[in-house]
């Protein structure tokens, strides 16, 4: 059976079998488990964590929300802290880490071994350097529109290189999807004109006119 959208959280028997099979074939150090707290309510994690622990994972990453809670509800750091005290392996926290303040709150409230950043990195690709500066006790450098322009240029070229068959119009459409996240906080004119670009030349001209 294939379990979609964290559906395995509803069947501890299926989870137990899958984790056991993975543990049997993965070499030491390679077995990481990532999960949410449960499907409906956070207290389901009390039953889920012992199943995970029984297979001696090398690390566990916890998105501290349930499936039903999606991505918009508050996170539950107390469950990550509980897991860190129960497991013998490193526990990594995930969920709503969008800037230095939320990262510091996670460290203070849950004391995880590490942090996993997902969607926030699409909106703010500089978050990693910002967190590094904050945890080193240094102020983060202020971002400029030129930083964003440099990022767009690199993203365009890198994603183009990854395509086996480059089609300009399709690539521009793909870039628009990426920049839906990054465009937040930029002038409204950027989003307005960027979405109307049809060619690579027009796309880059719009970016340069507004951001340079």
Predicted regions and their residues:
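Alpha/beta catalytic cores of nucleotide-metabolism and tRNA/nucleoside-modifying enzymes
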Residues: 17-20, 25-26, 30, 45-59, ...
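Residue-level preference for long, well-ordered alpha-helices that form the structural scaffold
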Residues: 11, 41, 72, 141-144, ...
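Conserved beta-alpha-beta core of the PfkB/ribokinase-like small-molecule kinase fold
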Residues: 6-8, 15-23, 33-36, 40
């Amino acid at each position: 059976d294939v379990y979609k959208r964290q559906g395995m959280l509803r069947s501890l028997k299926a989870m137990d079998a899958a984790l056991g099979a993975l543990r049997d074939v993965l070499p030491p150090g390679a077995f990481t488990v990532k999960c949410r707290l449960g499907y409906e309510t956070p207290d389901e994690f009390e039953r889920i964590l012992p199943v995970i622990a029984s297979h001696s994972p090398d690390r566990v990453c916890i998105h501290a929300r349930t499936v039903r809670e999606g991505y918009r509800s508050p996170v539950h750091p107390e469950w990550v802290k509980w897991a860190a005290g129960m497991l013998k392996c490193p526990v990594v926290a995930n969920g709503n880490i969008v800037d230095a303040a939320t990262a510091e709150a996670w460290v203070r409230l849950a004391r995880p071994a590490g942090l996993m950043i997902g969607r926030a990195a699409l909106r703010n690709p500089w978050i990693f350097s910002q967190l590094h500066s904050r945890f080193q006790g240094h102020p983060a450098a202020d971002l400029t529109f030129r930083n964003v322009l440099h990022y767009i240029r690199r993203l365009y070229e890198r994603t183009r290189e990854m395509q086996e068959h480059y089609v300009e119009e399709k690539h521009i459409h793909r870039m628009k999807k990426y920049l839906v996240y990054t465009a937040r906080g930029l002038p409204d004119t950027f989003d307005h004109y960027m979405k109307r670009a049809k060619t690579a030349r027009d796309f880059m001209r719009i970016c340069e006119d507004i951001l340079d």
